[in-house]
Amino acid sequence: MAESVERLQQRVEELERELAQERSRRALGSGDGGGGRARIEKMSSEVVDSNPYSRLMALKRMGIVSDYEKIRTFTVAIVGVGGVGSVTAEMLTRCGIGKLLLFDYDKVELANMNRLFFQPHQAGLSKVQAAEHTLRNINPDVLFEVHNYNITTVENFEHFMNRISNGGLEEGKPVDLVLSCVDNFEARMTINTACNELGQTWMESGVSENAVSGHIQLIIPGESACFACAPPLVVAANIDEKTLKREGVCAASLPTTMGVVAGILVQNVLKFLLNFGTVSFYLGYNAMQDFFPTMSMKPNPQCDDRNCRKQQKEYKKKVAALPKQEVIQEEGEIIHEDNEWGIELVSEISEEELKKSSGPIPDLPEGIIVAYTVPQKQEDSVPEVTVEDSGESLEDLMAKMKNI
């Protein structure tokens, strides 16, 4: 009880300070949006202590990004403002993104304090409200739109679809990118369903239950595998993830892993939006071996999501409509023009032997090939040996053997 009273007193003091700051700003007529500074209309590369964008604009001078100011024209929606999502939102805010849409239904708890960003005095507030308050103070140039609800319910799903398709920097325009920073399969599938239906590009992220590995994945509907194309093992095995949760047992959580995953996620977002570097379709992280595997996955033609299959057909039509570029094959340079000794390269096995050593190739979906085939077992043919009957009796044969 005493802790609750103390927490409420701290919250009252915080609100009183905010009120005093707001009254002071209005009295001075500064017109700033929070954070103790006026809004900056245009990014500048001027190197002065009062310019929060000077080091970001230095990327242009160093030839990394051609037009960094373009970042202020983009809108990003973040679903899940927890360990990864809150840090992702903070990084994008510091980078000067144009607009952020935040979706989460949960509240800040003291158990969240190990996952960066949130502060103890914010316990009890909704995560989106606490995040918006902190982020506005960090960068008042960014526009924020927060929604405190669960996107997996039927009524909220329609509103979620509406906001990602109309909540861009210019109202009525779609967002440029959706980031999934949720921690359960149901929410990921909800985002996947919405983005497949709208043809919306999105990035998925996650941290393992033991907190020592994570990943990010870029999903372009029709072009790359969606989340339903290759479901996690726990889902493929028909296991209800709700039954995995036990009372008094929770998943591990490391702020270091959360920070690394959020960092590579935002890095991929910046490369995708500002068109520099190589954008990874899948990038993993294993803290135990410091291993960062990368790969790309083609969509599954037999995906359970009908909108995914529809997007695949549209993507194939788009690719087929592109003008075909003629591939000019360059002849390899001849190292030795003359062959004085008549040397020839001969295969170790003939084509007939190669066919016998290979088995039948199974019928697989497009894009999947077998590494090897199992040859069919052939029964060893034993030549028949016939012996002519000599006509001698068994006693005569035994007598001959004794004389040998």
Curated annotation (Swiss-Prot):
The active site is at C250. Disulfide bonds: none annotated. One of its GO terms (biological process) is reticulophagy. A motif (UFC1-binding sequence (UFC)) lies at residues 389-404. InterPro entries: D-isomer_DH_CS1 (IPR029752), ThiF/MoeB/HesA (IPR045886), ThiF_NAD_FAD-bd (IPR000594), Ubiquitin-activating_enz (IPR035985). GO terms for cellular component: cytoplasm; cytosol; endoplasmic reticulum membrane; Golgi apparatus; nucleus. Homodimer; homodimerization is required for UFM1 activation. Interacts (via UIS motif) with UFM1; binds UFM1 via a trans-binding mechanism in which UFM1 interacts with distinct sites in both subunits of the UBA5 homodimer. Interacts (via C-terminus) with UFC1. Interacts (via UIS motif) with GABARAPL2 and, with lower affinity, with GABARAP and GABARAPL1. This is Ubiquitin-like modifier-activating enzyme 5. It comes from Bos taurus.
